[in-house]
């Protein structure tokens, strides 16, 4: 067993050692927290809350304030859900410390900012800045909070890894479809219908055809053409002239018929 004098000498040293360890741990925690944005008490004593916009958008907000050494300003993060179920996320950022009255009346500043936020019909789509009446005018220049533009989603890579190759592929598909829907290779083109004739043209053509067919029908088969009408003159001579006047009569008949 240790004597009573030794116990009395060890107790103060143990207390000092424990207190030193506690102080070192507290300093470490404070240093780690200085690099991360910490919640700031809002007008109702909390760092977050909920509200309903005039167009029935259910929104929740969270207020974050960076460390004094950080260059980024304060951020008011929002998450809203529209009546049709669509969800939106956005944030308002600014530097309220540029207002001279912010350090002394910080809670009043955020109360006025949140009041202006609740009046917006669509908080995540209204680009109007949020400004407290406490810091209106030149004394609060740069202290307003502005809507952060939302980043567009990255383009989806194609199979080959290049987004520009998707359009030519779509064009080639359209051409193959046109070829498939067109006439098959090797098939003759459809014959065009003959042009329609007018009734007057039909009658003229039919008359010409009949005139061309009549001489062929009246001419007996096996007989050739009758050049200069000599056969007809001979028949007239034999019919109307006697044998002794046959040559003279034939001469006059040929002369008359010319």
Swiss-Prot record:
GO terms in the biological process aspect are: cell-cell signaling; positive regulation of fibroblast growth factor receptor signaling pathway; positive regulation of vascular permeability
Principal location listed in the UniProt entry: secreted
From the record, what ranges are coiled-coil? Answer: none
Q: Please list the GO terms describing molecular function.
A: fibroblast growth factor binding; growth factor binding; heparin binding
> Which region ranges are annotated with the description Disordered?
146-231
Family per record: Belongs to the fibroblast growth factor-binding protein family.
Instruction: State the protein's name.
Output: Fibroblast growth factor-binding protein 3
Organism encoding this protein = Homo sapiens
Tell me the gene name: FGFBP3
């Amino acid at each position: 067993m240790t004597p009573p004098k030794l116990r009395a000498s060890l107790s103060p040293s143990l207390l000092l050692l424990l207190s030193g360890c506690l102080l070192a741990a507290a300093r470490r925690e404070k240093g780690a927290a200085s690099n991360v944005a910490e919640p700031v008490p809002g007008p109702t004593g909390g760092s977050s809350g909920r509200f309903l916009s005039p167009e029935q958008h259910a929104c929740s907000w969270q207020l974050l304030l960076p460390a004094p050494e950080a260059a980024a300003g304060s951020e008011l993060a929002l998450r809203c859900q529209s009546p049709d179920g669509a969800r939106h996320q956005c944030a308002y950022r600014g530097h309220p410390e540029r207002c001279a009255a912010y350090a002394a009346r910080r809670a009043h500043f955020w109360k006025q900012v949140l009041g202006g936020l609740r009046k917006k019909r669509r908080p995540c789509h209204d680009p109007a800045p949020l400004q407290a009446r406490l810091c209106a005018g030149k004394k609060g220049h740069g202290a307003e909070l502005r809507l952060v533009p939302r980043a567009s989603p990255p383009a989806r890579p194609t199979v080959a890894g290049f987004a520009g190759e998707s359009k030519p592929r779509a064009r080639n598909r359209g051409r193959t479809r046109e070829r498939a829907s067109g006439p098959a290779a090797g098939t003759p083109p459809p014959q065009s219908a003959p042009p329609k004739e007018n009734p007057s043209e039909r009658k003229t053509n039919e008359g010409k055809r009949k005139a061309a067919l009549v001489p062929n029908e009246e001419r007996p088969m096996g007989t050739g053409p009758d050049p200069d009408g000599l056969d007809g003159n001979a028949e007239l001579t034999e019919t109307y002239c006697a044998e002794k006047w046959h040559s003279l009569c034939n001469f006059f008949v040929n002369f008359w018929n010319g």
